Amino acid sequence: MESLRAHRLLALVRGKDPAAALRTVTTLAEEGIAAVEVSLTTTDALTVIERARAELGPDALIGAGTVRTPADAARAVDAGASCLVTPAVVDGLAGIGVPVLMGALTPTEIERALALGGAAIKLFPASLGGPDYLSALRSPFPDGRFVHVDIVPAPGSPCSPRTAGPSGSTAVRTARACRGMT
């Protein structure tokens, strides 16, 4: 979590070509993007994580995203993931050995994610509430660490959600912790 907080950017890699996904992860690292999340929806995602870990070393922040079950989490950690990102609240991840950014949107989901040991709450989809919603959440959850997640496409980029094709493209998104990073 400290590394993510320091770098303020988490690149998301998702696609159907595992070789391209691995090249994307290593290229991002070479270009100074210190934290990369490989979505488990990527074809052969665990192999991509494993190979990226072998190429980039033990200090690289390589996360597994779209973790939906404890079995997903265990396989991702075994492959070398140094953090997990879930799209929703997932039971059974306490004690997994790596930080978990747990997806939540409503106060009920946030309370549950915190009770389950989420290192941070991935406010997703953050665009539904915006800054006012986040400010409102800070009142009942003053100790909660929130990660605001949005897609940040370049104009005309294949990363744009409007132009991302079914072949699977690389998307880059920011993960800005809204507590302790601003």
Task: Tell me the role of every PLM-derived stretch.
Residues 52, 56, 93-97, 137, ...:
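Hydrophobic positions in alpha-helices of CheY-like receiver
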